[in-house]
Amino acid sequence: MWYMRWEGVSDGLKVTAGSVIQRDDLVQYTTTDDATSSGGVLRVPIACSSAGAVGNADDGTALILVTPVNGLPSSGVADTLTGGFDTEELETWRARVIERYYWTPQGGADGDYVVWAKEVPGITRAWTYRHLMGTGTVGVMIASSDLINPIPEESTETAARQHIGPLAPVAGSDLYVFRPVAHTVDFHIRVTPDTPEIRAAITAELRSFLLRDGYPQGELKVSRISEAISGANGEYSHQLLAPVDNISIAKNELAVLGTISWT
């Protein structure tokens, strides 16, 4: 269940079902039941108007009640907005089916763990690490192909562990399923022409680049970063001011976009 929460409010304030709530990026939610404040707290159940992961939000993310309620601030915060998954894209599904067709389970080979992990909703990539926690142990690192945040939710990690465990040898007693650590990469760019549209296009290209090249034990090469920027629609020329050196990604990491500074 998802909620919007207010704290430090008067008791007896009521938000009715069907009220519209909006996030800063214009994603909308609707209250699914009536709720009344008590003990200075108002917590109302909500559902996102759009299907998939777009409705997920970190606890504390600002939300706005579109229709004001007398005595209640319009601004509240997200509370437990997790667990939304995008419908698997056709090409991703096709690739997974083909992979399963060509890769017959072999009783716990490295590729088996990857195939099993991808059978869990929200997981499109996985890596197997033998002897991760000692001789005989198997580590499985899981991730999605989300361009903004490929690190799965804790609930997805739990689901993967529960799914793989019975399939793995010895009922998965030596199995460790875990999520990657985000390796945040910041950029400093001078671009010509410099418009909001071109900045957005460059941002999109960099996200796609990090998904392709920012895999565990990979290396982000400065030349390929520049190549990605040059592929942005409308970009004529640019200067990559940072990073200036290639960036190595550790075996337990995935590269994710940090801050882009524009000059």
Swiss-Prot record:
Protein name: Putative protein JayE
Family statement: Belongs to the Mu gp47/PBSX XkdT family.
Organism for this UniProt entry: Escherichia coli (strain K12)
Superkingdom to which the source organism belongs: Bacteria
Any Pfam family hit: Baseplate_J
Remaining remarks: Encoded by the e14 prophage.
